[in-house]
Amino acid sequence: MKIGVIGSGSFGTALGSLLADKGYEVTLWCRNDSQIESINRNHINNKHLPDFTLPEKLTASKDLRTVVQGKDMIVSSPPSHALTEILREIKEYLPEKVPIVSASKGIENGTLRLVSEIFESELPGKYHSYLSYLSGPSFAKEIIQKVPTIVSIASRSETTARKVQEIFSFLYFRTYWTPDVIGVEVGGSLKNVIALAAGVSDGLGFGQNTRAALITRGLNEITKIGLKLGADPMTFLGPSGMGDLILTCCGGQSRNRTVGFRLGKGETLEQILSGMNEVAEGIKTTQSAYELSQKLGIEMAITNEVYKMLYEDKNPKEVVKDLMKRDLKREGVLV
């Protein structure tokens, strides 16, 4: 089996490494010449994962057509804000009747489209039943280190979901399939917003009580907007919901939590982003999530406060104070 992976960041590389580890021939799309040379000659992604040796069956190419054309499966893992442009470029030579697996997380700025809506808008209908979406608690470095990991595979086609499930499942990588595309996407996108808040809390020196509160109320917000969009509430108790939320809010490898932590320590967003090698999706997603909550008429207190902190320069200490001063609520209802 020949597989093309679009995106050479840490997660795309990790998924490509997993698939190559299973014996598949994997071609990774990279824009950077030195990165391509490093992967092909030394089997190291020198830009994103310099400490890990990649399988020999994983190679890299700058030619997007070469990566995509004639492959038996496509894995798409670019930042969500770059997805529309990439799909418009590849659709003329995208193979038909092969699984297309998206691992991108986010809500498109401006259009407020989920990743699945971008795929279904940009690709002809003949591709739609072959689309699937991978999400769950999975740091790239730990996948490469072969740490036992679980994720969700969502597709509106059970045939596609089960096929992708079989292709990805391995000794250290277990997959669960679900038809709930919306739930998997909402959980995978909005957990990054909550992780920013959790990072701020840690940066301000608050304890684990506060982090647990943010995770709990954050899950409430994710579930509310998910239900409004038609998701199955049980999805948010699975790998792509609670699982990913806990990992992203607590794990030291979380880029979004790290951005929040540094904001809590007093750095500006501009200072933080200037030194980052990878995208923290939660920054752009916060804007889209805020606008979507306003459009749908849903109260999302944590999301609103993170938005004010990122885009209106609100002091992180004031964010926490205002969250704690909110009107008292009844537990057990999505409010």
UniProtKB/Swiss-Prot annotation:
Enzyme Commission number(s) of this protein: 1.1.1.94
Residues given in the record as sn-glycerol 3-phosphate binding sites: K105, G136, S138, K191, D244, S254, R255, N256
Gene3D superfamilies to which the protein is assigned, alphabetical: N-(1-d-carboxylethyl)-l-norvaline Dehydrogenase, domain 2 (1.10.1040.10), NAD(P)-binding Rossmann-like Domain (3.40.50.720)
Catalytic site: K191
Gene Ontology cellular component terms for the protein in this record: cytosol
UniProt-annotated binding residues for NADPH: S10, F11, R31, K105, A140, R255, V279, E281
Cellular localization per UniProt: Cytoplasm
Record's keyword terms, sorted: Cytoplasm, Lipid biosynthesis, Lipid metabolism, NAD, NADP, Nucleotide-binding, Oxidoreductase, Phospholipid biosynthesis, Phospholipid metabolism
GO molecular function: glycerol-3-phosphate dehydrogenase [NAD(P)+] activity; NAD binding
InterPro entries: 6-PGluconate_DH-like_C_sf, 6PGD_dom2, G3P_DH_NAD-dep, G3P_DH_NAD-dep_C, G3P_DH_NAD-dep_N, NAD(P)-bd_dom_sf
Pathway named in the protein's UniProt entry: Membrane lipid metabolism; glycerophospholipid metabolism
Catalytic activity: sn-glycerol 3-phosphate + NAD(+) = dihydroxyacetone phosphate + NADH + H(+); sn-glycerol 3-phosphate + NADP(+) = dihydroxyacetone phosphate + NADPH + H(+)
Primary localization class, coarse: cytoplasm
Listed GO biological process terms: carbohydrate metabolic process; glycerol-3-phosphate biosynthetic process; glycerol-3-phosphate catabolic process; glycerophospholipid metabolic process; phospholipid biosynthetic process
Membership in a protein family: Belongs to the NAD-dependent glycerol-3-phosphate dehydrogenase family.
HAMAP family tied to this protein: NAD_Glyc3P_dehydrog
Function: Catalyzes the reduction of the glycolytic intermediate dihydroxyacetone phosphate (DHAP) to sn-glycerol 3-phosphate (G3P), the key precursor for phospholipid synthesis.
PANTHER family the record matches: GLYCEROL-3-PHOSPHATE DEHYDROGENASE, GLYCEROL-3-PHOSPHATE DEHYDROGENASE [NAD(+)] 2, CHLOROPLASTIC
Protein name: Glycerol-3-phosphate dehydrogenase [NAD(P)+]
Species the sequence originates in: Leptospira borgpetersenii serovar Hardjo-bovis (strain L550)
